[in-house]
Amino acid sequence: VGFKAGVKEYKLTYYTPTYETKDTDILAAFRVTPQPGVPPEEAGAAVAAESSTGTWITVWTDGLTSLDRYKGRCYHIEPVAGEESQFIAYVAYPLDLFEEGSVTNMFTSIVGNVFGFKALRALRLEDLRIPVAYVKTFQGPPHGIQVERDKLNKYGRPLLGCTIKPKLGLSAKNYGRAVYECLRGGLDFTKDDENVNSQPFMRWRDRFLFCAEALYKAQAETGEIKGHYLNATAGTCEEMMKRAIFARELGVPIVMHDYLTGGFTANTSLAHYCRDNGLLLHIHRAMHAVIDRQKNHGIHFRVLAKALRMSGGDHIHSGTVVGKLEGEREITLGFVDLLRDDFVEKDRSRGIYFTQDWVSLPGVLPVASGGIHVWHMPALTEIFGDDSVLQFGGGTLGHPWGNAPGAVANRVALEACVQARNEGRDLAREGNEIIREASKWSPELAAACEVWKEIKFEFEAMDTL
């Protein structure tokens, strides 16, 4: 057959509704909004083509390879209820298209080019199914949930954290003092804010030293293991590693990284270092809403969460369901399960498009953070369960008596909720009463209850099904 030049419709090659997906394929669910007049099959096929082997024209060198072996295929299209112009296109990618152990390469292939495509008005990657064969090429989280509990010797309850505020402007010594007060009061962790790196008012090395001093002092006084998430994020990978190495030399238990602004390549390098050197790795998702907040365009956070589990991190921020930041309950619980569990069944009511088998990849602790306070404690304990980190920044440091009493209030509230749950009480129904009872014997909690009794952030979540 001679080579026939010319532009042909994508769907002739890339729309294959009879295709049986393989266990080794990476499967993607895209929410596609085509330009008027572009039929769904053509739009779905265009997505498959442009994110795999295709280009806009038949090329001579197509004859030198086997397209059937390497092309992405749009194998199913379904309408979106209530949205005339949108549909879900399912695309299968052969495993050979991807470099082993590289989240960077996976994203460059699947979402790197196709989002600017003219025939589409909007495109959103809703979910990915990562095949076991590909999962096994990743190290994943440095330690995972069980190893973290063993390192910290803390079981049977969520962990408590606090972001040090004001996030910018404190000197290293005053910053360390705030860390000490919070840990001394009963928190497990304190945290650098995501944008605390190494600024003129507080260079990273000074902060690391004062925070290490604070946590050792609090550890000695409370007999509990304490941690402060030292943010190693930096302008270059070399500088990031230098900071992580210094943290290890100080003997602290945990460091932190902003995985989206820092990038997946840097994140995976840091995760490997953390596993080799016994450091836990806390991950902040700064910039995620730029990517995941629009309903019809971008990448859903559940995909970014899966990518983080592959790249590596022991904690990741995942919304609160109840505080000031985005997150609808069922959807949030869907990706929380994808972070923690070994095996997650397909469940469209929770936004999970594919059954995901993580085999033995360690799990990640979800971190609830943002506008939460003691009155939220029963709901958070019920929604997130034991394997989570509950982080109260303003909800600790905003206590009228100061940081340590703020920490005491949170710890008492948490212990009361865990005890009530273990006794079989219904946290959703009796939550306020449980907190009130506990506040009778904790003046710190009583003061916190008074301050936060009426604060709510009431807006509709954008991220609904």
From Swiss-Prot:
One Pfam entry name: RuBisCO_large
PANTHER family, alphabetized: RIBULOSE BISPHOSPHATE CARBOXYLASE (PTHR42704), RIBULOSE BISPHOSPHATE CARBOXYLASE LARGE CHAIN (PTHR42704:SF15)
Function: RuBisCO catalyzes two reactions: the carboxylation of D-ribulose 1,5-bisphosphate, the primary event in carbon dioxide fixation, as well as the oxidative fragmentation of the pentose substrate in the photorespiration process. Both reactions occur simultaneously and in competition at the same active site.
Reactions mediated catalytically: 2 (2R)-3-phosphoglycerate + 2 H(+) = D-ribulose 1,5-bisphosphate + CO2 + H2O; D-ribulose 1,5-bisphosphate + O2 = 2-phosphoglycolate + (2R)-3-phosphoglycerate + 2 H(+)
Entry's localization field: Plastid, Chloroplast
Chain positions of site Transition state stabilizer: K324
Name under which the protein is recorded: Ribulose bisphosphate carboxylase large chain
Species: Cornus florida (Flowering dogwood)
Principal location listed in the UniProt entry: plastid
Top-level taxon: Eukaryota
Extra remark: The basic functional RuBisCO is composed of a large chain homodimer in a 'head-to-tail' conformation. In form I RuBisCO this homodimer is arranged in a barrel-like tetramer with the small subunits forming a tetrameric 'cap' on each end of the 'barrel'.
Keywords: Calvin cycle, Carbon dioxide fixation, Chloroplast, Disulfide bond, Lyase, Magnesium, Metal-binding, Methylation, Monooxygenase, Oxidoreductase, Photorespiration, Photosynthesis, Plastid
Post-translational modification: The disulfide bond which can form in the large chain dimeric partners within the hexadecamer appears to be associated with oxidative stress and protein turnover.
